[in-house]
Amino acid sequence: MNIFADFTARVTKAVEALDLKDKDGISPDLSRIAVEPPRDASHGDLATNAAMVLAKPTGQNPRALAEKLALALRDDKDVAAAEVAGPGFVNLRLKDGFWQAHLSALLGDGRNYGRSTVGAGRKTNVEYVSANPTGPMHVGHCRGAVVGDALANLMAFAGYDVTKEYVINDAGGQIDVLGRSVILRYREALGDEIGEIPPGLYPGDYLVPLGQALAKEFGHGLLQMPEDEALAIVKDRAIDAMMAMIRDDLALLNVHHDVFFSERTLHADNARKIRSAINDLTLKGHIYKGKLPPPKGEKPDDWEDREQTLFRSTAVGDDMDRALVKSDGSFTYFAADVAYLKDKVDRGFVDLIYVLGADHGGYVKRLEALARAIAGDEVKLTVLLCNLVKLYRDGEPIRMSKRSGDFVTLREVVEEVGRDAIRFMMLYRKSDAPLDFDFAKVTEQSKDNPVFYVQYASARCHSVFRQASEQLGEANFDRKSLAAAAASLTDEGEIGLIRKLAEYPRLIESAALALEPHRLAFYLYDLASSFHGHWNRGTDNPDLRFVKVNDRQLTHARLGLVQAVSDVLTSGLTLIGAAAPTEMR
Protein backbone atom coordinates (compact mmCIF):
# COMPACT_ATOMS: atom_id res chain seq x y z
CA MET A 1 0.00 0.00 0.00
CA ASN A 2 2.74 2.43 -0.95
CA ILE A 3 0.71 5.36 -2.28
CA PHE A 4 3.82 6.91 -3.79
CA ALA A 5 4.50 3.80 -5.87
CA ASP A 6 0.80 3.70 -6.75
CA PHE A 7 0.78 7.29 -8.00
CA THR A 8 4.11 6.86 -9.77
CA ALA A 9 2.35 4.16 -11.80
CA ARG A 10 -0.63 6.47 -12.40
CA VAL A 11 1.58 9.37 -13.50
CA THR A 12 3.56 7.04 -15.77
CA LYS A 13 0.32 5.85 -17.36
CA ALA A 14 -0.77 9.46 -17.90
CA VAL A 15 2.59 10.24 -19.53
CA GLU A 16 2.27 7.21 -21.80
CA ALA A 17 -1.12 8.52 -22.93
CA LEU A 18 0.59 11.74 -24.06
CA ASP A 19 2.58 9.61 -26.55
CA LEU A 20 5.83 11.54 -26.13
CA LYS A 21 8.75 10.90 -28.50
CA ASP A 22 12.36 11.97 -28.65
CA LYS A 23 14.01 13.46 -31.76
CA ASP A 24 14.43 9.95 -33.20
CA GLY A 25 10.76 9.11 -32.71
CA ILE A 26 11.48 6.78 -29.79
CA SER A 27 9.51 6.80 -26.55
CA PRO A 28 11.62 8.28 -23.72
CA ASP A 29 12.84 6.41 -20.65
CA LEU A 30 10.18 6.81 -17.95
CA SER A 31 12.15 5.17 -15.12
CA ARG A 32 13.22 8.52 -13.64
CA ILE A 33 9.64 9.59 -12.96
CA ALA A 34 9.13 9.99 -9.23
CA VAL A 35 6.25 10.92 -6.96
CA GLU A 36 7.20 12.26 -3.54
CA PRO A 37 5.77 14.36 -0.72
CA PRO A 38 6.13 18.06 -1.59
CA ARG A 39 8.72 19.96 0.43
CA ASP A 40 5.99 22.35 1.56
CA ALA A 41 2.83 20.54 2.71
CA SER A 42 0.74 23.57 1.74
CA HIS A 43 1.51 22.82 -1.92
CA GLY A 44 -0.47 19.58 -1.87
CA ASP A 45 -0.25 15.93 -0.98
CA LEU A 46 2.06 14.64 -3.73
CA ALA A 47 4.49 16.11 -6.24
CA THR A 48 5.92 14.63 -9.43
CA ASN A 49 9.02 15.52 -11.42
CA ALA A 50 7.75 13.82 -14.61
CA ALA A 51 7.69 16.94 -16.79
CA MET A 52 11.10 18.03 -15.51
CA VAL A 53 12.86 14.78 -16.42
CA LEU A 54 11.06 14.30 -19.76
CA ALA A 55 11.23 17.83 -21.16
CA LYS A 56 14.80 17.68 -22.45
CA PRO A 57 14.69 14.24 -24.14
CA THR A 58 11.38 15.13 -25.84
CA GLY A 59 12.41 18.69 -26.75
CA GLN A 60 9.55 20.33 -24.87
CA ASN A 61 9.29 23.22 -22.46
CA PRO A 62 9.04 21.64 -18.98
CA ARG A 63 6.29 23.93 -17.77
CA ALA A 64 4.23 23.47 -20.93
CA LEU A 65 4.65 19.70 -20.61
CA ALA A 66 3.64 19.93 -16.95
CA GLU A 67 0.42 21.72 -17.95
CA LYS A 68 -0.45 18.85 -20.30
CA LEU A 69 0.28 16.29 -17.60
CA ALA A 70 -1.71 18.19 -14.98
CA LEU A 71 -4.69 18.30 -17.33
CA ALA A 72 -4.51 14.52 -17.77
CA LEU A 73 -4.12 13.84 -14.05
CA ARG A 74 -7.22 15.87 -13.20
CA ASP A 75 -9.23 13.02 -14.71
CA ASP A 76 -7.97 10.63 -12.02
CA LYS A 77 -10.85 9.68 -9.71
CA ASP A 78 -8.78 10.35 -6.58
CA VAL A 79 -7.27 13.69 -7.61
CA ALA A 80 -8.99 16.82 -6.34
CA ALA A 81 -6.51 19.22 -7.95
CA ALA A 82 -3.40 19.10 -10.12
CA GLU A 83 -1.38 22.30 -10.31
CA VAL A 84 1.88 23.26 -12.00
CA ALA A 85 4.52 24.77 -9.74
CA GLY A 86 7.94 26.29 -10.29
CA PRO A 87 9.82 25.27 -13.44
CA GLY A 88 7.60 22.25 -14.11
CA PHE A 89 6.63 20.26 -11.05
CA VAL A 90 3.06 19.00 -10.80
CA ASN A 91 1.50 19.10 -7.34
CA LEU A 92 -1.45 16.85 -6.61
CA ARG A 93 -4.09 17.31 -3.96
CA LEU A 94 -6.08 14.15 -3.26
CA LYS A 95 -9.74 13.85 -2.32
CA ASP A 96 -10.74 13.13 1.26
CA GLY A 97 -12.33 9.93 0.03
CA PHE A 98 -8.93 8.61 -1.02
CA TRP A 99 -7.48 9.19 2.45
CA GLN A 100 -10.54 7.71 4.15
CA ALA A 101 -10.28 4.58 1.98
CA HIS A 102 -6.55 4.38 2.71
CA LEU A 103 -7.22 4.46 6.45
CA SER A 104 -9.74 1.63 6.06
CA ALA A 105 -7.16 -0.45 4.18
CA LEU A 106 -4.51 0.35 6.78
CA LEU A 107 -6.78 -0.93 9.54
CA GLY A 108 -7.22 -4.14 7.56
CA ASP A 109 -3.45 -4.64 7.40
CA GLY A 110 -2.90 -3.80 11.06
CA ARG A 111 0.71 -4.12 12.13
CA ASN A 112 1.60 -5.61 8.75
CA TYR A 113 0.95 -2.21 7.21
CA GLY A 114 4.14 -1.15 5.45
CA ARG A 115 5.44 -4.69 4.99
CA SER A 116 7.05 -4.78 1.55
CA THR A 117 8.36 -7.13 -1.10
CA VAL A 118 10.98 -4.67 -2.36
CA GLY A 119 13.71 -7.01 -1.08
CA ALA A 120 12.38 -9.75 -3.37
CA GLY A 121 13.65 -12.47 -1.03
CA ARG A 122 17.31 -11.56 -1.62
CA LYS A 123 19.45 -13.64 0.70
CA THR A 124 21.14 -11.11 2.96
CA ASN A 125 23.78 -11.51 5.66
CA VAL A 126 24.07 -8.74 8.24
CA GLU A 127 27.15 -9.18 10.42
CA TYR A 128 27.32 -6.95 13.47
CA VAL A 129 28.83 -6.68 16.96
CA SER A 130 31.43 -9.48 16.51
CA ALA A 131 33.26 -8.21 19.61
CA ASN A 132 36.34 -10.14 20.67
CA PRO A 133 35.32 -12.79 23.25
CA THR A 134 37.63 -11.33 25.87
CA GLY A 135 35.19 -9.66 28.24
CA PRO A 136 31.70 -8.29 28.79
CA MET A 137 30.08 -5.96 26.30
CA HIS A 138 30.79 -2.29 26.95
CA VAL A 139 28.85 0.76 25.87
CA GLY A 140 31.08 1.18 22.83
CA HIS A 141 29.49 -1.97 21.41
CA CYS A 142 25.94 -0.64 21.82
CA ARG A 143 25.72 1.40 18.67
CA GLY A 144 26.84 -1.29 16.24
CA ALA A 145 24.60 -3.80 17.99
CA VAL A 146 21.53 -1.59 17.67
CA VAL A 147 22.25 -0.38 14.13
CA GLY A 148 22.90 -3.91 12.86
CA ASP A 149 19.91 -5.44 14.62
CA ALA A 150 17.46 -2.70 13.61
CA LEU A 151 18.73 -2.79 10.02
CA ALA A 152 18.24 -6.56 9.88
CA ASN A 153 14.70 -6.20 11.27
CA LEU A 154 13.93 -3.44 8.79
CA MET A 155 15.24 -5.39 5.80
CA ALA A 156 13.30 -8.51 6.80
CA PHE A 157 10.12 -6.37 6.99
CA ALA A 158 10.96 -5.05 3.52
CA GLY A 159 11.11 -8.53 2.01
CA TYR A 160 14.76 -9.56 2.31
CA ASP A 161 15.72 -13.04 3.54
CA VAL A 162 17.95 -11.90 6.39
CA THR A 163 20.45 -13.77 8.54
CA LYS A 164 21.86 -11.99 11.59
CA GLU A 165 25.46 -13.10 12.11
CA TYR A 166 28.16 -12.71 14.74
CA VAL A 167 31.69 -13.84 13.96
CA ILE A 168 33.56 -15.08 17.02
CA ASN A 169 37.17 -13.90 16.78
CA ASP A 170 38.47 -16.95 18.63
CA ALA A 171 41.64 -17.63 16.64
CA GLY A 172 43.78 -14.53 17.20
CA GLY A 173 46.51 -13.56 19.61
CA GLN A 174 43.98 -11.90 21.92
CA ILE A 175 42.72 -15.39 22.83
CA ASP A 176 46.20 -16.37 24.03
CA VAL A 177 46.21 -13.21 26.15
CA LEU A 178 42.77 -14.14 27.49
CA GLY A 179 43.93 -17.67 28.33
CA ARG A 180 46.98 -16.43 30.24
CA SER A 181 44.83 -13.87 32.07
CA VAL A 182 42.44 -16.63 33.16
CA ILE A 183 45.30 -18.89 34.29
CA LEU A 184 46.42 -16.06 36.55
CA ARG A 185 42.93 -15.89 38.08
CA TYR A 186 42.92 -19.69 38.36
CA ARG A 187 46.16 -19.57 40.35
CA GLU A 188 44.66 -16.81 42.49
CA ALA A 189 41.65 -19.04 43.22
CA LEU A 190 44.05 -21.77 44.34
CA GLY A 191 45.57 -19.40 46.89
CA ASP A 192 48.57 -18.01 45.00
CA GLU A 193 49.46 -14.37 45.59
CA ILE A 194 49.41 -12.93 42.07
CA GLY A 195 49.98 -9.26 42.92
CA GLU A 196 49.20 -6.70 40.23
CA ILE A 197 48.05 -8.02 36.87
CA PRO A 198 51.06 -7.78 34.52
CA PRO A 199 50.82 -5.30 31.63
CA GLY A 200 49.32 -6.80 28.49
CA LEU A 201 46.89 -9.12 30.30
CA TYR A 202 43.20 -8.48 30.94
CA PRO A 203 42.86 -7.15 34.50
CA GLY A 204 39.06 -7.08 34.82
CA ASP A 205 37.40 -8.75 37.81
CA TYR A 206 34.98 -10.45 35.41
CA LEU A 207 37.60 -13.21 35.01
CA VAL A 208 37.64 -14.04 38.74
CA PRO A 209 34.56 -16.35 38.65
CA LEU A 210 36.06 -18.24 35.71
CA GLY A 211 39.30 -18.78 37.62
CA GLN A 212 37.30 -20.04 40.59
CA ALA A 213 35.30 -22.43 38.39
CA LEU A 214 38.51 -23.88 36.94
CA ALA A 215 39.98 -24.32 40.42
CA LYS A 216 36.85 -26.17 41.50
CA GLU A 217 36.88 -28.41 38.41
CA PHE A 218 40.59 -29.17 38.10
CA GLY A 219 42.11 -28.44 41.49
CA HIS A 220 45.87 -28.14 40.86
CA GLY A 221 45.57 -30.39 37.81
CA LEU A 222 46.09 -27.68 35.20
CA LEU A 223 49.39 -26.66 36.80
CA GLN A 224 50.62 -30.24 36.49
CA MET A 225 49.92 -30.43 32.73
CA PRO A 226 52.24 -29.28 29.95
CA GLU A 227 51.70 -25.53 29.55
CA ASP A 228 50.35 -25.76 25.99
CA GLU A 229 47.83 -28.44 26.97
CA ALA A 230 46.61 -26.47 29.98
CA LEU A 231 46.40 -23.25 27.98
CA ALA A 232 44.31 -24.96 25.28
CA ILE A 233 41.80 -26.17 27.90
CA VAL A 234 41.64 -22.77 29.57
CA LYS A 235 41.15 -20.95 26.27
CA ASP A 236 38.24 -23.21 25.33
CA ARG A 237 36.59 -22.67 28.71
CA ALA A 238 37.26 -18.93 28.54
CA ILE A 239 35.76 -18.52 25.07
CA ASP A 240 32.63 -20.43 26.11
CA ALA A 241 32.29 -18.35 29.28
CA MET A 242 32.88 -15.03 27.52
CA MET A 243 30.43 -15.85 24.72
CA ALA A 244 27.78 -16.86 27.27
CA MET A 245 28.35 -13.50 28.97
CA ILE A 246 28.19 -11.65 25.64
CA ARG A 247 24.96 -13.42 24.63
CA ASP A 248 23.41 -12.50 27.97
CA ASP A 249 24.53 -8.89 27.60
CA LEU A 250 23.13 -8.65 24.08
CA ALA A 251 19.84 -10.19 25.21
CA LEU A 252 19.47 -7.30 27.67
CA LEU A 253 19.49 -5.06 24.61
CA ASN A 254 17.04 -7.34 22.77
CA VAL A 255 19.76 -8.33 20.29
CA HIS A 256 19.67 -11.96 19.15
CA HIS A 257 21.78 -13.43 16.33
CA ASP A 258 20.81 -16.33 14.09
CA VAL A 259 24.39 -17.54 13.52
CA PHE A 260 27.53 -17.42 15.66
CA PHE A 261 30.40 -18.20 13.28
CA SER A 262 33.66 -19.38 14.85
CA GLU A 263 36.83 -18.11 13.20
CA ARG A 264 38.52 -21.28 14.43
CA THR A 265 36.55 -23.30 11.88
CA LEU A 266 38.47 -21.51 9.13
CA HIS A 267 41.76 -22.76 10.61
CA ALA A 268 40.53 -26.29 11.32
CA ASP A 269 41.77 -29.32 9.36
CA ASN A 270 45.08 -27.67 8.48
CA ALA A 271 43.30 -24.40 7.53
CA ARG A 272 41.41 -26.22 4.78
CA LYS A 273 38.90 -23.41 4.20
CA ILE A 274 41.60 -20.74 3.99
CA ARG A 275 43.70 -22.81 1.57
CA SER A 276 40.63 -23.51 -0.56
CA ALA A 277 39.69 -19.83 -0.73
CA ILE A 278 43.22 -18.81 -1.70
CA ASN A 279 43.32 -21.56 -4.32
CA ASP A 280 40.06 -20.25 -5.76
CA LEU A 281 41.54 -16.76 -6.08
CA THR A 282 44.72 -18.24 -7.58
CA LEU A 283 42.71 -19.93 -10.32
CA LYS A 284 41.07 -16.57 -11.07
CA GLY A 285 44.48 -14.90 -11.40
CA HIS A 286 44.28 -12.78 -8.25
CA ILE A 287 47.24 -14.32 -6.36
CA TYR A 288 50.93 -13.77 -7.10
CA LYS A 289 54.37 -13.91 -5.51
CA GLY A 290 55.97 -10.54 -4.97
CA LYS A 291 57.24 -7.85 -2.61
CA LEU A 292 55.13 -5.15 -1.02
CA PRO A 293 56.54 -1.63 -1.16
CA PRO A 294 57.60 -0.27 2.24
CA PRO A 295 54.82 1.62 4.02
CA LYS A 296 54.98 5.40 4.01
CA GLY A 297 56.52 6.97 7.09
CA GLU A 298 58.09 4.89 9.84
CA LYS A 299 58.19 1.18 9.07
CA PRO A 300 56.29 -1.05 11.52
CA ASP A 301 58.36 -3.60 13.46
CA ASP A 302 56.78 -6.55 11.64
CA TRP A 303 57.39 -5.24 8.10
CA GLU A 304 59.73 -7.43 6.07
CA ASP A 305 61.41 -6.84 2.74
CA ARG A 306 60.77 -10.31 1.33
CA GLU A 307 58.84 -12.13 -1.35
CA GLN A 308 55.33 -12.99 -0.18
CA THR A 309 52.11 -14.59 -1.34
CA LEU A 310 49.94 -11.59 -2.21
CA PHE A 311 46.35 -10.88 -3.20
CA ARG A 312 46.31 -8.49 -6.15
CA SER A 313 43.61 -6.34 -4.54
CA THR A 314 44.69 -3.14 -6.32
CA ALA A 315 43.29 -4.67 -9.52
CA VAL A 316 39.82 -4.72 -7.95
CA GLY A 317 39.71 -1.35 -6.24
CA ASP A 318 41.94 -1.54 -3.14
CA ASP A 319 44.74 0.89 -2.26
CA MET A 320 47.41 -1.79 -1.91
CA ASP A 321 47.91 -5.51 -2.41
CA ARG A 322 47.46 -7.70 0.66
CA ALA A 323 49.75 -10.32 2.19
CA LEU A 324 48.22 -13.74 2.87
CA VAL A 325 51.07 -15.70 4.51
CA LYS A 326 53.39 -14.61 7.33
CA SER A 327 57.12 -15.30 7.37
CA ASP A 328 56.56 -18.20 9.79
CA GLY A 329 54.22 -19.86 7.30
CA SER A 330 51.01 -19.10 9.19
CA PHE A 331 48.18 -17.20 7.55
CA THR A 332 47.53 -13.50 8.04
CA TYR A 333 44.30 -12.10 9.46
CA PHE A 334 43.38 -11.04 5.94
CA ALA A 335 43.68 -14.64 4.73
CA ALA A 336 41.00 -15.56 7.26
CA ASP A 337 38.88 -12.67 5.93
CA VAL A 338 39.21 -14.19 2.46
CA ALA A 339 37.95 -17.57 3.65
CA TYR A 340 35.15 -16.07 5.74
CA LEU A 341 33.82 -13.94 2.90
CA LYS A 342 33.97 -16.90 0.52
CA ASP A 343 32.10 -18.98 3.09
CA LYS A 344 29.29 -16.42 3.07
CA VAL A 345 29.15 -16.49 -0.71
CA ASP A 346 29.14 -20.30 -0.68
CA ARG A 347 26.15 -20.17 1.69
CA GLY A 348 24.23 -18.32 -1.01
CA PHE A 349 24.21 -14.76 0.30
CA VAL A 350 24.00 -12.07 -2.38
CA ASP A 351 23.91 -9.05 -0.05
CA LEU A 352 26.74 -8.90 2.48
CA ILE A 353 26.50 -6.14 5.07
CA TYR A 354 29.23 -5.52 7.64
CA VAL A 355 28.46 -3.17 10.53
CA LEU A 356 31.81 -2.04 11.92
CA GLY A 357 33.21 0.63 14.20
CA ALA A 358 34.59 3.79 12.64
CA ASP A 359 38.11 2.62 13.57
CA HIS A 360 37.68 -0.12 10.95
CA GLY A 361 37.41 2.36 8.08
CA GLY A 362 40.56 0.91 6.56
CA TYR A 363 38.74 -2.39 6.01
CA VAL A 364 36.17 -0.97 3.61
CA LYS A 365 38.17 -0.99 0.38
CA ARG A 366 39.85 -4.32 1.05
CA LEU A 367 36.52 -6.06 1.76
CA GLU A 368 34.89 -4.51 -1.30
CA ALA A 369 37.85 -5.58 -3.44
CA LEU A 370 37.71 -9.07 -1.99
CA ALA A 371 34.00 -9.41 -2.79
CA ARG A 372 34.63 -8.36 -6.40
CA ALA A 373 37.45 -10.88 -6.75
CA ILE A 374 35.46 -13.75 -5.25
CA ALA A 375 32.01 -13.16 -6.72
CA GLY A 376 32.20 -10.35 -9.27
CA ASP A 377 28.85 -8.62 -9.71
CA GLU A 378 26.89 -11.51 -8.20
CA VAL A 379 27.35 -10.20 -4.66
CA LYS A 380 26.85 -6.72 -3.26
CA LEU A 381 29.00 -5.91 -0.23
CA THR A 382 28.38 -2.85 1.93
CA VAL A 383 30.25 -1.71 5.03
CA LEU A 384 28.39 0.53 7.47
CA LEU A 385 30.66 2.39 9.86
CA CYS A 386 29.39 3.39 13.30
CA ASN A 387 30.99 6.48 14.76
CA LEU A 388 31.93 6.92 18.38
CA VAL A 389 29.42 7.27 21.19
CA LYS A 390 30.42 9.79 23.84
CA LEU A 391 28.90 9.23 27.27
CA TYR A 392 27.81 12.08 29.49
CA ARG A 393 26.09 12.44 32.82
CA ASP A 394 24.44 15.84 33.27
CA GLY A 395 26.77 17.23 30.62
CA GLU A 396 29.94 15.83 32.20
CA PRO A 397 31.88 13.30 30.07
CA ILE A 398 32.33 9.72 31.29
CA ARG A 399 35.56 7.99 30.31
CA MET A 400 35.98 4.28 29.67
CA SER A 401 38.88 1.95 28.92
CA LYS A 402 38.48 -1.78 28.37
CA ARG A 403 42.13 -2.84 28.73
CA SER A 404 42.46 -1.11 32.11
CA GLY A 405 39.44 -2.96 33.43
CA ASP A 406 37.74 0.37 34.15
CA PHE A 407 34.93 0.59 31.62
CA VAL A 408 31.22 1.23 31.47
CA THR A 409 29.51 -2.03 30.60
CA LEU A 410 26.47 -2.43 28.41
CA ARG A 411 24.72 -4.07 31.35
CA GLU A 412 25.28 -1.01 33.55
CA VAL A 413 23.84 1.31 30.92
CA VAL A 414 20.77 -0.88 30.34
CA GLU A 415 20.13 -1.12 34.07
CA GLU A 416 20.34 2.66 34.47
CA VAL A 417 18.39 4.00 31.49
CA GLY A 418 16.57 0.96 30.09
CA ARG A 419 16.76 -0.98 26.85
CA ASP A 420 14.30 1.19 24.95
CA ALA A 421 16.19 4.43 25.53
CA ILE A 422 19.40 2.87 24.25
CA ARG A 423 17.82 1.25 21.19
CA PHE A 424 16.00 4.40 20.14
CA MET A 425 18.75 6.93 20.85
CA MET A 426 21.45 4.87 19.13
CA LEU A 427 19.36 5.32 15.98
CA TYR A 428 18.62 8.99 16.45
CA ARG A 429 21.66 9.98 14.43
CA LYS A 430 22.98 8.56 11.18
CA SER A 431 25.40 5.78 12.08
CA ASP A 432 28.51 7.51 10.69
CA ALA A 433 27.87 10.70 12.71
CA PRO A 434 29.23 11.09 16.26
CA LEU A 435 26.62 10.54 18.98
CA ASP A 436 26.42 12.11 22.43
CA PHE A 437 24.54 9.97 24.95
CA ASP A 438 23.62 11.74 28.18
CA PHE A 439 22.20 9.50 30.92
CA ALA A 440 20.12 12.36 32.31
CA LYS A 441 18.61 13.51 29.02
CA VAL A 442 17.53 10.06 27.81
CA THR A 443 15.45 9.57 30.95
CA GLU A 444 13.72 12.96 30.83
CA GLN A 445 9.96 12.93 30.45
CA SER A 446 9.76 15.67 27.85
CA LYS A 447 9.44 16.37 24.15
CA ASP A 448 13.22 16.79 24.08
CA ASN A 449 13.62 13.07 24.85
CA PRO A 450 12.62 11.35 21.59
CA VAL A 451 12.06 7.87 23.00
CA PHE A 452 9.77 9.19 25.76
CA TYR A 453 7.89 11.34 23.25
CA VAL A 454 7.25 8.42 20.89
CA GLN A 455 6.35 5.94 23.62
CA TYR A 456 4.06 8.52 25.23
CA ALA A 457 2.17 8.72 21.93
CA SER A 458 1.73 4.94 22.01
CA ALA A 459 0.44 5.06 25.59
CA ARG A 460 -1.93 7.90 24.73
CA CYS A 461 -3.44 5.84 21.90
CA HIS A 462 -4.31 3.09 24.35
CA SER A 463 -5.67 5.58 26.86
CA VAL A 464 -8.15 6.81 24.23
CA PHE A 465 -9.57 3.29 23.91
CA ARG A 466 -9.82 2.91 27.67
CA GLN A 467 -11.70 6.20 27.84
CA ALA A 468 -13.97 5.19 24.95
CA SER A 469 -14.79 1.88 26.62
CA GLU A 470 -15.80 3.66 29.81
CA GLN A 471 -17.88 6.35 28.12
CA LEU A 472 -19.52 4.23 25.41
CA GLY A 473 -19.88 1.02 27.37
CA GLU A 474 -18.11 -1.02 24.66
CA ALA A 475 -15.51 -3.52 25.83
CA ASN A 476 -14.01 -4.12 22.40
CA PHE A 477 -13.90 -2.17 19.16
CA ASP A 478 -13.97 -4.27 16.01
CA ARG A 479 -11.50 -3.13 13.36
CA LYS A 480 -14.06 -3.64 10.60
CA SER A 481 -16.57 -1.32 12.26
CA LEU A 482 -13.84 1.28 12.82
CA ALA A 483 -12.75 0.99 9.17
CA ALA A 484 -16.34 1.27 7.94
CA ALA A 485 -16.73 4.58 9.78
CA ALA A 486 -13.64 6.20 8.21
CA ALA A 487 -15.73 8.28 5.79
CA SER A 488 -16.77 10.47 8.74
CA LEU A 489 -13.25 11.91 9.01
CA THR A 490 -13.15 15.30 7.28
CA ASP A 491 -11.19 17.56 9.64
CA GLU A 492 -7.92 18.74 8.11
CA GLY A 493 -5.99 17.58 11.17
CA GLU A 494 -7.44 14.09 10.84
CA ILE A 495 -6.69 13.93 7.12
CA GLY A 496 -3.19 15.23 7.87
CA LEU A 497 -2.60 12.36 10.28
CA ILE A 498 -3.65 9.86 7.62
CA ARG A 499 -1.20 11.53 5.22
CA LYS A 500 1.59 11.08 7.74
CA LEU A 501 0.64 7.42 8.26
CA ALA A 502 0.65 6.90 4.48
CA GLU A 503 4.35 7.83 4.37
CA TYR A 504 5.25 4.71 6.38
CA PRO A 505 5.38 2.11 3.55
CA ARG A 506 7.58 4.43 1.47
CA LEU A 507 9.77 5.05 4.51
CA ILE A 508 10.22 1.31 5.06
CA GLU A 509 11.29 0.72 1.46
CA SER A 510 13.59 3.73 1.15
CA ALA A 511 15.28 3.12 4.52
CA ALA A 512 15.82 -0.56 3.69
CA LEU A 513 17.22 0.19 0.24
CA ALA A 514 19.51 2.91 1.62
CA LEU A 515 20.52 0.75 4.64
CA GLU A 516 19.59 3.65 6.94
CA PRO A 517 17.54 2.49 9.93
CA HIS A 518 17.87 5.91 11.57
CA ARG A 519 15.20 7.16 9.16
CA LEU A 520 12.71 5.01 11.05
CA ALA A 521 13.46 6.74 14.36
CA PHE A 522 13.08 10.15 12.72
CA TYR A 523 9.74 9.17 11.16
CA LEU A 524 8.35 7.82 14.43
CA TYR A 525 9.21 11.08 16.17
CA ASP A 526 7.45 13.05 13.43
CA LEU A 527 4.38 10.80 13.63
CA ALA A 528 4.29 11.14 17.42
CA SER A 529 4.58 14.91 17.06
CA SER A 530 1.64 14.97 14.62
CA PHE A 531 -0.46 12.84 16.97
CA HIS A 532 0.37 14.90 20.06
CA GLY A 533 -0.43 18.05 18.08
CA HIS A 534 -3.84 16.72 17.11
CA TRP A 535 -4.45 15.63 20.72
CA ASN A 536 -3.71 19.19 21.86
CA ARG A 537 -6.19 20.57 19.32
CA GLY A 538 -8.84 18.41 20.96
CA THR A 539 -7.87 19.81 24.35
CA ASP A 540 -8.60 23.32 23.07
CA ASN A 541 -11.63 22.39 20.95
CA PRO A 542 -14.05 19.78 22.39
CA ASP A 543 -15.49 19.13 18.91
CA LEU A 544 -12.17 17.58 17.88
CA ARG A 545 -11.86 15.14 20.77
CA PHE A 546 -11.55 11.49 19.87
CA VAL A 547 -14.56 10.38 21.93
CA LYS A 548 -17.93 12.03 21.20
CA VAL A 549 -20.53 10.24 23.28
CA ASN A 550 -23.39 11.77 21.28
CA ASP A 551 -21.89 10.72 17.91
CA ARG A 552 -20.92 7.05 17.94
CA GLN A 553 -20.20 6.96 14.17
CA LEU A 554 -17.71 9.82 14.37
CA THR A 555 -16.18 8.33 17.51
CA HIS A 556 -15.64 5.01 15.73
CA ALA A 557 -14.02 6.84 12.81
CA ARG A 558 -11.66 8.69 15.14
CA LEU A 559 -10.91 5.53 17.09
CA GLY A 560 -9.97 3.95 13.77
CA LEU A 561 -7.49 6.78 13.24
CA VAL A 562 -6.07 6.29 16.73
CA GLN A 563 -5.81 2.53 16.13
CA ALA A 564 -3.91 3.18 12.90
CA VAL A 565 -1.47 5.49 14.68
CA SER A 566 -1.00 2.84 17.36
CA ASP A 567 -0.41 0.15 14.73
CA VAL A 568 2.31 2.14 12.97
CA LEU A 569 3.98 3.24 16.20
CA THR A 570 4.01 -0.38 17.41
CA SER A 571 5.33 -1.64 14.07
CA GLY A 572 8.11 0.93 13.95
CA LEU A 573 9.13 0.55 17.58
CA THR A 574 9.20 -3.23 17.15
CA LEU A 575 11.56 -2.90 14.19
CA ILE A 576 13.78 -0.61 16.24
CA GLY A 577 13.66 -3.16 19.05
CA ALA A 578 11.85 -0.99 21.60
CA ALA A 579 8.53 -1.50 23.35
CA ALA A 580 5.26 0.22 22.45
CA PRO A 581 3.78 0.75 25.93
CA THR A 582 0.05 0.76 26.64
CA GLU A 583 0.61 3.14 29.54
CA MET A 584 3.54 5.10 30.95
CA ARG A 585 4.85 4.01 34.33
Swiss-Prot record:
Gene, per the UniProt record: argS
PROSITE patterns: AA_TRNA_LIGASE_I
Gene Ontology biological process: arginyl-tRNA aminoacylation
Gene Ontology MF term list: arginine-tRNA ligase activity; ATP binding
EC nos: 6.1.1.19
Catalytic activity: tRNA(Arg) + L-arginine + ATP = L-arginyl-tRNA(Arg) + AMP + diphosphate
Entry's family note: Belongs to the class-I aminoacyl-tRNA synthetase family.
SMART domains assigned to the protein according to its UniProt record, in alphabetical order: Arg_tRNA_synt_N, DALR_1
Stated name of the protein: Arginine--tRNA ligase
Complex and partners: Monomer.
